[in-house]
Regions:
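Residue-level recognition of tetratricopeptide repeat
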Residues: 87, 121, 176, 213-215, ...
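N-terminal leader/linker segments that initiate helical-solenoid repeat arrays
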Residues: 21-80, 84
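Canonical positions in the second alpha-helix
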Residues: 71, 104-105, 138-139, 160, ...
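Short coil turns that delineate tetratricopeptide repeat
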Residues: 76, 110, 144, 165, ...
């Protein structure tokens, strides 16, 4: 097992000047979005542009954006119109525009927790973890003592059944920001609270996954085993099957070759593959197989799916290695 003192080292992203990237283009006046623009700088110093979207997905996302834009144009100060415009922009990888939309919304509705929740999520996407945490902590403060609400899915699952709520998504993303920075200790109480409050198996497995990894990174193997104890093959998940299979791997109930299927050839890896691959990579790392872990993390980063949490987490692992 890798020593916990090494694994728990906080992540502090290097300061990189975006204007120093010679490949960046300048937006022209009146242009809503230049597809060559830099959306973010990775934790490894790479420029990140638009999301890699398939020819099958792109038209649907663009149609959804047009619908959200139309609703926004009709009611530009309505909080829901603002939120959906920002969400639809973000699905297309237009993250900076989405952040700007949420920021304008906050100027109109400064007490609306949904706006901070969504802007915080997108600050994670662009690797601005401190800003993400500030927004998500603000969102959390705004919902104290208020009833929870189901969060509508932007891309509904197979049963068209939302699995998340406002409160749970605030906490999920806040704890994730701590995890990605390497501040595993601060993530723990948030994960425990969310695990206690989870009302469906999709939430249970997604929270248990990151909670387990946080405990293992801190060298708390017994507590981590306790998180795994209630996980079983019979859990009813709608969209988080990857997390369930990874947890069963960690529990010793699935072989690794049944969890990570070969990546599709000839294109960018899927979000699901990036998520699962990170789970396998960290499993190797936790069991002392550094070379195997490094190989998988590099494969994820080469895959191009830079908005996936598994991609960001793999990037963070590689960035820590550079600074050792």
């Amino acid at each position: 097992m890798v020593a916990s003192t090494t694994l728990a080292r906080p992540l502090f992203a290097a300061v990189i000047t975006i204007t120093g990237c010679t490949s960046r283009s300048v937006d022209t006046p009146g242009t809503v979005f230049d597809r060559r623009r830099v959306e973010a700088i990775s934790l490894l110093g790479d420029t990140l542009r638009e999301f890699p979207l398939s020819a099958e997905v792109l038209p649907r996302y663009e149609r959804q954006l047009a619908e959200a834009r139309s609703a926004y144009d009709r009611t530009p100060t309505n909080a829901d119109s603002i939120i959906w415009l920002g969400r639809r922009l973000a699905y297309l990888g237009r993250i900076r525009e989405a952040i700007d939309v949420f920021t304008r919304g906050i100027s109109i509705h400064p007490q609306n927790p949904w706006l901070y929740r969504h802007r915080g999520h997108r600050y994670i996407t662009v690797r601005e973890f401190d800003r993400a945490m500030a927004d998500l902590e603000r969102a959390a403060s705004l919902v104290v003592g208020k009833p929870d609400e189901v969060e509508p899915d932007g891309q509904p699952n197979a049963l068209n059944q939302p699995i998340g709520t406002l409160h749970s998504n605030i906490d999920y993303h806040l704890a994730l920001a701590h995890y990605l920075k390497g501040d595993f200790e601060r993530a723990l109480p948030i994960y425990q609270r969310e695990l206690d409050n989870a009302r469906n198996d999709d939430r249970r497995v997604s929270i248990a996954y990151w909670y387990y990894l946080s405990l293992r990174r801190l060298g708390r193997a017994d507590a981590a085993a306790g998180v795994l104890a209630p996980i079983s093959r019979g859990m009813k998940v709608i969209e988080n099957d990857s997390y369930l299979r990874l947890l069963l791997l960690y529990k010793g109930e699935l072989p690794v070759d049944s969890v990570l299927v070969p990546a599709p050839g000839g294109g960018v890896m899927s979000v699901t593959y990036a998520t699962t691959a990170y789970g396998i990579g960290i499993w190797h790392l936790l069991n002392g197989r550094d070379a195997e872990a490094d190989q998988i993390f590099r494969r994820i980063v080469a895959g191009g799916q830079w908005g996936a949490f598994g991609y960001i987490a793999a990037e963070a692992e590689l960035a820590r290695r550079v600074r050792r």
